[in-house]
Amino acid sequence: MELIYRSTRNANETATASQAILKGLANEGGLFVPDSIPALDVSLEDLAKMNYQQVAYEVMKLMFTDFTEEELKHCINSAYDKKFDTPEIAPLVHKAGAYYLELFHGSTIAFKDMALSILPYLLTTSAKKNHVKNEIVILTATSGDTGKAALAGFADVPGTKIIVFYPKHGVSPIQEKQMVTQKGENTFVVGITGNFDDAQTGVKKMFSDEKLASYMDEKGYQFSSANSINIGRLVPQMVYYVYAYTRLVKDGTIQAGDKINVVVPTGNFGNILAAYYAKEMGLPIAKFVCASNDNKVLYDFFTTGTYDRNREFILTTSPSMDILISSNLERLIYKIAGNDAEKNAALMKQLSTEGVYTITDEMKAKLAEFAGGYATEAETSATIKKVYESDSYIMDTHTAVAATVYDKYVKETGDKTPTVIASTASPYKFTRSVMESIDEAYAAKSDFELVDELCKLSGVKVPQAIEDIRTAPVLHDTVCDKEEMESVVKKFLNI
C-alpha cells in the first residue's frame, strides 16, 4: 500500500514519498508528513541480528513505499559504505551512566552525515521516477553542520547544484573552514551577516515564492532542500534509533520490548522528531528528553505550552542549536492538533506575525512523553571536563548539553530507565570550546594545535575531515546581507 504524505498547512496537498523528497517544502510553507506511520513488520529480535544497512532498509521501505526494493537498497548501500570510519556506522558507547549513540563517524564528522549521505541518492532516484528534466538546485540554510554534510553529499552529483547559506559570525572556525574549502563545480557557499534564523527564513521565502519558481522553471531549474524540513532527511534519522535499540538487545542490556529513554540535543527539532516517529513505528521509547542550550525556546515551550521566539538570540559554544525558530516542531504541532492542517496553519501564521503562539491544554496533554531541559554555557563546559576526568571520554559541546540535561533529569525524576544520548558531533569539530573546558591553559594555542592536543588526550585519531582542511585553500568567500540572498542565488545560476 502506498503511503501518502500531506502538507501540515493544507489537507488537500498530497505527495508520494519521492514527490515530497523532490519538493522539500510543501506549498504555503507547510511540511510534508506521512498520513500514518506503519508499524515495523520485523521483530525487534530479528532486527538485532541485522547490520546498519539491513535495519535501514526495514525502516525506510515502510516510509518510502514508492521506491522499489532495488532502488532503496542501492541508495542505502551507496550511502553507508567506506565514507564512514567504522563498519558499525553508528556505534553505541557506554560511558558515564548512559549509552552514547555516536552519530559522527561519517565524512564531515557530524550527525548530519547520517541523512545527508543518502539524500543525494534518494533525490536523484526521485527525479528519475518523476521524469524531472530540470536541474535541481539544493537550497540550504545551516547553523554549522548541515552545510558541510550537504555540500559533501551533493558535490559533483550530476543534475544538481547546491547553495549553502550560513551565519558568517555564528559557526565555529572549523565548521567555517570545512565549508569554505569545499570542492565541486556545482557548490556555492555564502556567509550572511545575520543569524541562522535569518538564513532559514530567507531560504523558506525563496521556496514559497511562486514567481521565482516559474522563472527558475523557464531557465531549467527547480529548488529542493537538504534541510531537515525535507522528509528525505527525517526518515533516515529514524533508522539510528531503531539500530541503537537493537544493539542494546543484542548485547543483553535490555530485552526486546523493554523501554528506553532518549536524550537529544535539539535545535531545529528534526533529530528528536525522528526518534518520536521511530516510537510511532513501534520502538519502545518511554521519554524523549529535549535538551536546549541558552536559546531555550523549546524548553520553555514544553514547560509552559507557549512558543515564543521574541527573545534575544544568544551565540553559544553549541552553535548548531542556536535557533529560535525550530522548523520541525511544526510536524509535532500538526500531530497533537489531531492532524488538523487548518489549526496548525493558524498557529504558524501567529508565529510568523506575532512571534508567539500557545497550544491548548488538550494539545499539551499529548506531550506527556516529552521532557524539556537546558544547559548553560558554564554547565556544558563543566560536563565536558567532568566526563573526561571520570571516564576518559571526550564529547563535543552539543553532546555535553544533552549529558548535562540528562543528569538534571535523573536528579529531578529518579528515572533510571536505560538511556541513549544522541552524540551529534565529533569533539574535533569544536576543538577550542572542548579543550578550553578541559583546561583553560589551552586558550593560547591555535585551532590546529588544539586538534593535535585533542588527539593526545583522547587517543582518537584525527579524522580525515580535519586533516583535509588543515592546508586546504579557501574557495568560497561570498558574503551578503539577508536581503540579498535571492540575487546571490540568481547570480550563481547565471539567470
Locations of regions flagged by a protein language model:
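PLP-dependent amino-acid enzyme catalytic core
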Residues: M1-I495
